[in-house]
């Protein structure tokens, strides 16, 4: 495995971080046994100006996390399943990246397959117990690493975000084109290469 992504990696706009997380290695030791997978799909969410952002829903725990320290896990429940986000934003802003799907590496198969954000969390044993974990620190239950074995020059595609009723007019869902471990979500506008 390559080097651990530094804290500074997450101190950038969420869309930049989401795109650059593709191909990186997510390690979850949340259940005690460590599992590794390659990030294949991610969505960017901004602050209160983003109609799909949780930052618009009051000033509770999630709002504080979105404005909080970049590089920390943000785990919350939706539709009876856990979702894993990584806080990412420029200084003084808010934002996070929702990890939607990943390709299992070790073990080579996970049940359920980690395709879609709820299934990713379930397959990697992610729940509120890892909320706030620093993904840039060794020994954390969740970490993100460089991937020296990533396919050189894989194509990144992008589209609108999945399952949002009101969206920004930007393609904020990024994924590895042609990878079988990407959700088959219907979104508009149509996917394009980014």
Curated annotation (Swiss-Prot):
Superkingdom of origin: Archaea
Annotated CDD domains: AAG (cd00540)
MF terms in GO: alkylbase DNA N-glycosylase activity; DNA binding
One Pfam family of this chain: Pur_DNA_glyco
Transmembrane segments: none
Enzyme Commission number(s) from the entry: 3.2.2.-
Keyword DNA repair: yes
Gene3D superfamilies, sorted: Methylpurine-DNA glycosylase (MPG)
GO BP field: base-excision repair
Sorted UniProt keywords: DNA damage, DNA repair, Hydrolase
Uppermost EC category: hydrolase
InterPro entries (alphabetical): Formyl_transferase-like_C_sf (IPR011034), MPG (IPR003180), MPG_sf (IPR036995)
Family: Belongs to the DNA glycosylase MPG family.
Protein name: Putative 3-methyladenine DNA glycosylase
